[in-house]
Amino acid sequence: MRAQNNLTVEVDCHSLGSNECPSMTSSFSPMDSPTPTPTSIYSQGSLASPGWQDAGSYPGHAYERHTGTTPMRSAFRLAGMTSNENMAMSYGAMEAQERMPMPDFLSAYDDNVEHFWLPSDAPKTYETGTHSLPYPHTLPQCPPMVRSNYRPHAAYLPEAATNPCLSRSIFHHAERVPQSMSMGNMMPWIPQASESIAPQTIAPSQVGPVTPPPSYSEFPTSIQTFKTHSPTTPLRSCSIGTASGPDTPISRMSGGAADYLEDFQQSPPFRDGLNRLQRHPSRKMIRKQSSRQNMSLENLPSIIKQVQFKCKEPGCKGRFKRQEHLKRHMKSHSKEKPHVCWVPGCERAFSRSDNLNAHYTKTHSKRGGRNRYVATLDESSPDYDPDFRGQLTPDGRPIRGSTLDDPMPDTREYSVDGLDD
C-alpha cells in the first residue's frame, strides 16, 4: 500500500524566474520551509511537536522541493489516492509503532485519546481540491488551555471538552462546520494564553452600555432591545429584555425581579384573578358588613314578622316558632307554680320543672353559699342521691329513713359524730 501512494510536489512559480526555481531531488524537511508549517507552528510553543522533524526520511514517499530566495508557499498533493478512498485510516488496523500518542501531539491531552489520533505518515498540508482542506498556517488565536497547579493524579476534564478549538477534528472539512461555530465568531471571545485572568472590582460608574456579541445576530427578531443598567454591586451584568410579547425565560431575566414583577402584574392570568377577587369578595367580609348593618334598628330584618306564635299577655313581646314553646312560655305568666323545691327551709316554687332542676344544680349543690347545701344533690359527694326526699342534717347530709313530713330533727341528736357511730 505504501508503494502505491507516492507523493509529488507542485510549486506555483509564476512570479519567479527560471533560475530561481531549480528542481531539487533532496528530501523535504519541514524545518527548512520559509512559510509557517505545522512543524514551525509547534516549534513556536503553542503545541507540543509530534516529532515530524525527527523522523528523518519517509520511506515510500518521494518529495520534490523547489527553493528560492523569495519566500513562497509550498503545496503538497497526495497523488496515489483515488477519489473513492477514505482519508481516515482504521485505528485498529494500524501497527503499534505507527500509532502516534496524543500527548505528543497536543499538550495536556493525556486521557481519552482513542477518538482523536493522527497517523505518523499523514501529510502536513493539502491543496484545495476534492480531498482538500486549507490548513491554517498560523494559530495565534487558539492557544492551549494552560493548567495551573498541575496534579498528575487529579481527575479533570480533557482539553477537548473545555477548549472550543479542539472540539472538532482538524481534518474535518470546512463546510461541515456551521457558521456560528466558525473561528471568526469564536476567536474574539477566547482569552489569550498570555493574559492572566485576575479578579477585578468594577465600580458602577465604569460599567457602560453592553453591546451584544456578533453571534447574537442569529437570535430571533423577538429580541428587539437590549437593556443596560448600572448595578449597585461591583459586578458586571447586562440584561436582555423584550419590548412586548408573552412571558418567556428571556423576559424573566430582564431587569431583575422588579421588571419581571411588573410584567407578571400585567399578564392576563394575574389581571383575571385580581378582577375575580374584586368582583367576588370573601364570605368573611360579607358577614362583617352585614353584621355592621344589622346593628342599626333601621336595617333590622323582617324575620320577626314571619314568626306566627305570639304571646297574648299584655305587655309581653314574646314570639316563638313552635306551639309548645308558646305553651311553656304562658306558664311563666300564670299564677300556678306546681314545681316546688323539696329542700327543707327553701320551698321555692316554679312553673316549669326544668327551672326547678336548674335551681337544684345552681343553688343547693354548692358549698359556701347563702342557700342550704344538700349533699344528695352534689355529684362530687359520696351521699349523692337525686331521688332522695327526706330530712337533712345541719351540714346537709341525708337522714336515711326520714320523710319530708317528719318534724325537723334536733341538732344535738343528729350530729356528725352520732351519724358516724
Swiss-Prot record:
A zinc finger (C2H2-type) spans 309-333, 339-364. The keyword Zinc-finger applies. Residues 228-242 have a biased composition (Polar residues). Pfam families: zf-C2H2. BrlA, abaA and wetA are pivotal regulators of conidiophore development and conidium maturation. They act individually and together to regulate their own expression and that of numerous other sporulation-specific genes. Binds promoters of target genes at brlA response elements (BREs) containing the conserved sequence 5'-(C/A)(A/G)AGGG(G/A)-3'. Residues 361-370 have a biased composition (Basic residues). Residues 228-247, 361-421 are annotated as: Disordered. It comes from Aspergillus parasiticus (strain ATCC 56775 / NRRL 5862 / SRRC 143 / SU-1). Induction: Expression is down-regulated by dioctatin A (DotA), a metabolite of Streptomyces. InterPro entries: Znf_C2H2_sf, Znf_C2H2_type. The gene is brlA. It is found in: Nucleus. GO terms for cellular component: chromatin; nucleus; transcription regulator complex. This is C2H2 type master regulator of conidiophore development brlA. Keywords: Activator, Conidiation, DNA-binding, Metal-binding, Nucleus, Repeat, Sporulation, Transcription, Transcription regulation, Zinc, Zinc-finger. One of its GO terms (biological process) is sporulation resulting in formation of a cellular spore. One of its GO terms (molecular function) is DNA-binding transcription factor activity, RNA polymerase II-specific.
